[in-house]
Every structure is written in C-alpha cells, then in structure tokens.
Amino acid sequence: MFHQKPTGVFPPEMALNAEVIKVLGKAGYLWTVTDDVPFSCCYGSVPFNWVPKQKQSEIAVFLRSNFWSNRISFNSVSGREFVEILEKDLTSWFRNQDGYLIIWMDWETFGHHKKGFIESFINPFFDRIAESKKVRLVSPDYLLKKYPRKEIDVPSGSWSTSASDFRNENYWPLWKDPNNEFHKLWWELTDLILKIKGNIKDEETLTVFDKAMYSCQTWQFSMGNKILAVEGLKYFREIASLKEAESIKKILDIIDKLEKLCQQG
C-alpha cells in the first residue's frame, strides 16, 4: 500500500454526493465507491455488467452490495459456505454472463468486531475462492477495463442510508440527520473550525483539526454512546485556544451545548 499511487478512493462511511464526486474527479481519481441502496431506490436495480459514471465527471462510481456485504458483517457464515452461496446466487443473477459484485466493509470487522472471524471466515474464504471455477477476486481497475461505463446521476447516500432514510431525504442519518440536534450543532461547530483551519500552516497544529473532525463523534451519539461522543470535543476546545480562533466565544458556546446534550439521559 505504501509508496503506491492509488487510482481510487473510499470516502469515509461511503458518504457520497455529486459535490464529493466532483472533488474526487478533480483530484485525479478514476473511481470511488458508495452503497447500492440509494441507487436501487432511484433506478430499481443495480448494474452488474456496466459501471455507473457520474454525469459531468469522468470518475466511475462502484456500488457496494449492501446485501452481500452485510451478510458477512452481521451474520455468522463461514468463508467456504459464503463462496458456495455466491456461486449459486450470482449464476442466477448474472444469467450465465460475466458480471461483478462489490463487497466492502471495515477491516476492523475481522478480528475486532467479530472475534475469530479471520480464522472462521477470511482464511477459508480465500481457500475456497482459489478452488472456485465461477468466482474470482479482481481489482476495481480490472473492472474498469472490462466493463463499459454509463453516464447516470448517482444519488446521495452512505453505507448506513436505508431505503426509508433515502426517501425522506435523510442521506446521512448517522452523521448529518437534520432532525438530530447534536448533529446540527456539531456541523455548525465544524463549519467554524474549517474557517480557522484555512489559516493554519503548522503541521502539528493541523493534526489537532484532524482529530477533532472525524465521523465517529456523530456516529457514537446516534448509537447512544454519549460518553464516546463527548470525548472528541476536547480537540475542539484545544482549537478554541488558538490565537487564530477569532470565534472563540461562539465555538465554546456550541461545545457547551453539545456537552449538555451528551449529559442528558
């Protein structure tokens, strides 16, 4: 992984919209990835023999299979059994044509969230894949060379956006829910912090901003883990102490409100 030039990028939480796609395209990436639920809500099905390309952009957008990825993440299935199910079900879906399936999840799924899952899933999965005559592992770059791209509007969403969330235009329910007071205040705070960050050049100081602005704070609050949600606010307080922070009072006021929300039952 190190000293390589990646051709694609995985956005945090697979949170994607047209604006992010545009930024990634300008950065020179050839592909990105997001969940297939919003796409399925819009178009009724998900492609297996062509790759979506966002309109007015050259970047391809792979669609991670929510069904198959979560079948690994949230079920007790062995690696060998999973490959055998894939062989059967994909043959039916692809109708004996070549096709592709994107399976994607956090690496922490294996061994951290699911103890012993490297031994029970990963190792036998790779062993069974090596034996298979129907299924093989390939890279996104390989898929870009093999399958045509079709221009289409890729809808906004994340890998935690349900069909119901999408229909209610709540595209990032665990991180930017318009009905969640913690989320609204956190993003108001983040907007203020980003204005300060633009004037910072010192690398050590910039690491404080990186620690402050990450998706776990809003996610933890959404999950009811308020102690962990409030933990990250200490970095915002550290930023408020910088000379460059002209909006110190407003920043501290918002932090106080966020902490009070975390103290509520």
Predicted regions and their residues:
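Binuclear metal-dependent hydrolase catalytic cores centered on His/Asp/Glu-rich metal-binding motifs
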Residues: I72-I85
